[in-house]
A protein has these predicted regions:
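Conserved non-catalytic scaffold segment of RNase H-like nuclease domains
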Residues: 2-8, 12-103, 149-150
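Short glycine-/acidic-enriched loop or helix-start segments at secondary-structure transitions
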Residues: 17, 111-113, 163-164
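Amphipathic alpha-helical interface surfaces
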Residues: 78, 82-86, 109, 116, ...
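Substrate-recognition/cap helix-loop segment adjacent to the acidic, metal-dependent catalytic center
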Residues: 108-126
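Short, flexible loop segments at boundaries between secondary-structure elements
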Residues: 127-142
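Short helix/strand-capping connector loops at secondary-structure junctions
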Residues: 143-151
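Conserved small/polar residues in nucleotide/adenosyl-binding loops
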Residues: 152-159
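Hydrophobic alpha-helical segments, chiefly the membrane-spanning helices
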Residues: 165-169
Length: 169
């Protein structure tokens, strides 16, 4: 169980945790070398239509084109159930407070977790591995390095895979 990393990606109706909601959660667990992957559940969460109707243009377009918006409207999975399913998956593979939370701009996802999935958020170590920060550093210090490996078609798993699998140009 030691040294495993928990990778997480959320899709939300917008960027403001106080007024927006989580509509999809994906989790994967890797070994410390990022060579072994255990994919967790990719859960589309039902949300009241008021949150979907009030999404800004970017989110409306992005989630419509990906098909996620239609999936959210059909989903019968509550936020609480999604939290429990995700937490149960993680508990099978990683002990409490043993892994930092890993992903792209993960500090922002963590804000949503704190509000809407507090049991899950408390399970992670307080540290983060934020791949967005690494990308910004690489862009400035090693611009020849690219991180554009797209191996999945679903939005959340793709984001996690991009975080996990940087490639060199």
């Amino acid at each position: 169980m030691e040294n495993k990393l928990i990778w997480l990606d959320l899709e939300m109706t917008g960027l403001e945790p106080q007024s927006e909601r989580i509509i999809e959660i994906f989790t994967a667990i890797t070994n410390e070398d990022l060579t072994e992957v255990i994919e967790g559940p990719n859960i589309v969460i039902s949300q009241p239509t008021e949150y979907l109707d009030n999404m800004d243009d970017w989110n409306q377009d992005h989630h419509s084109r990906s098909g996620l918006l239609d999936e959210v409207k059909k989903s019968e999975i509550s936020q609480e159930d999604a939290e429990l399913r995700t937490l149960n998956f993680i508990k099978e593979h990683v002990g409490k407070n043993k892994s930092p939370l890993c992903g792209n701009t993960i500090h922002h996802d963590r804000k949503f977790l704190t509000l809407y999935m507090p049991q899950l958020e408390e399970y992670f170590h307080y540290r983060n591995i934020d791949v967005s920060s690494l990308k910004e550093v690489a862009k400035r210090w090693r611009p020849e390095v690219t991180m554009d490996c797209l191996l999945y078609t679903s939005p959340s798993p793709r984001d996690v895979e991009e975080s996990r699998m940087p490639s060199s140009a």
